[in-house]
A protein has these predicted regions:
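Short loop segments at secondary-structure junctions
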Residues: 15-16, 96-99
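N-terminal low-complexity, Ser/Thr/acidic repeat segments characteristic of secreted
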Residues: 45-49, 94-96, 129-132
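Solvent-exposed loop/turn segments at secondary-structure junctions
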Residues: 1-3, 64-67, 85-87, 98-100
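Extracellular/periplasmic juxtamembrane helices and adjacent flexible linkers that interface
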Residues: 99-181
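A conserved helix-loop-strand patch within extracytoplasmic ligand-binding domains
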Residues: 1-3, 10-13
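Generic recognition of short, well-ordered alpha-helical interface segments
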Residues: 2-6, 24, 41-42, 87, ...
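Ligand-binding pocket segment of bilobal, Venus flytrap-like solute-binding proteins
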Residues: 13-82
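Small-molecule pocket liners
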Residues: 9, 88-92
């Protein structure tokens, strides 16, 4: 899933963005995956497996999932946000073929614009998403743990490079998974 890729890249980056090399990152990520008891299909299923079913001792997940679980009373477990972490970029797009077919391009484009307004960003922050609007980010800064340095997929070679290196058939992720069996 997308969440699994982000988690993998966060683990890898926690080594290489802290001065380590690829060999050290491979060992670290391999060691982490040796301890994985369940690989759910997405972030919400991961949360449910951990909080509702008690599977696993540690949950690696999106920050907003942990915040949402706490808000819903599913957990009082403390959580750690690494000081060097990956910025998860959730894309949003208007799909030409669909909006043209349904005649709703104008409202769809307006909605996409709205998502980046201070009003929408404040709502996202309420459920654990870090705002991308600088003003709102300052307003809610105290509600989120400090992160010293965020890196992006671009810092790891961009999506095409990341896909080829880590997630293509026979790439690093497959090799790690084969070692778990």
């Amino acid at each position: 899933s997308g969440g699994a890729k982000w988690n993998f890249l966060a683990l890898w980056g926690s080594v290489v963005k802290n001065g380590g090399n690829d060999a050290q990152a491979l060992k670290f990520v391999t060691d982490v995956f040796k301890n994985v008891v369940v690989l759910p299909k997405d972030a919400r299923e991961s949360s449910d497996a951990f909080y509702k079913k008690g599977q696993g001792d540690v949950l690696i997940n999106y920050e907003n999932e942990v915040i949402l679980a706490a808000q819903q009373g599913k957990t009082d477990t403390s959580y750690i946000i690494p000081p060097v972490n990956i910025s998860i970029e959730g894309p949003v797009a208007v799909v030409d073929k669909n909006v043209d077919k349904h005649g709703n391009r104008e409202v769809s484009e307006a909605f996409v614009k709205f998502l980046f307004t201070p009003e929408a960003q404040r709502e996202f922050a309420k459920v654990g998403f870090r705002p991308v609007d600088p003003t709102v980010s300052k307003e809610v800064k105290s509600k989120f743990p400090y992160i010293a340095r965020l890196y992006t997929v671009a810092d790891l070679g961009g999506w095409s490079g990341v896909q080829k290196k880590f997630f293509a058939d026979g790439a690093i992720f497959d090799k790690i998974q084969r070692g778990r069996r």
